[in-house]
């Protein structure tokens, strides 16, 4: 499969390129993604209350990964007929245990966060930030 060239369109995508070049750690990138808007393809029509949402799952080594994009324009038209926009932090918190995240699938800068990586990230975000009552 030929991967598409990745040219940054959004601030978080510039951060992805920094991480790819080694100027930003994977953990720091995930923290920045938590503050960014993500675009999640859905095979079902998403209602205002979130019902109908059915994310696109990609199998990687027997583990399910939810496909997400960092810009609305990145989703291939034939991947899913619908899309839900959500803040990364909200998405990560709602991601069920046992699921990983595939960011920008099909691009040469795609990112795979395995299920155990998402579990560790979510656990870190469950702890309050020093000096605040905010968990992250």
Language-model-derived ranges and their functions:
Residues 1-136:
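An interfacial alpha-helical scaffold signature
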């Amino acid at each position: 499969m030929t991967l598409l060239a990745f040219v940054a369109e959004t601030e978080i995508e510039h951060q992805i390129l920094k991480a790819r070049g080694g100027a930003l750690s994977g953990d720091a990138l995930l923290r920045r993604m938590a503050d960014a808007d993500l675009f999640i393809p859905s095979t079902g029509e998403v209602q205002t209350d979130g019902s109908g949402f059915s994310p696109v799952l990609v199998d990687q080594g027997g583990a399910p990964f939810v496909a997400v994009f960092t810009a609305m324009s990145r989703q291939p038209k034939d991947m899913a007929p619908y899309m839900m926009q959500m803040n990364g932090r909200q998405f990560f918190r709602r991601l069920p245990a046992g699921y990983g995240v595939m960011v920008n699938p099909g691009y040469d800068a795609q990112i795979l966060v395995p299920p155990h990586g998402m579990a560790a990230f979510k656990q870190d975000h469950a702890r309050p930030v020093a000096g605040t009552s905010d968990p992250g």
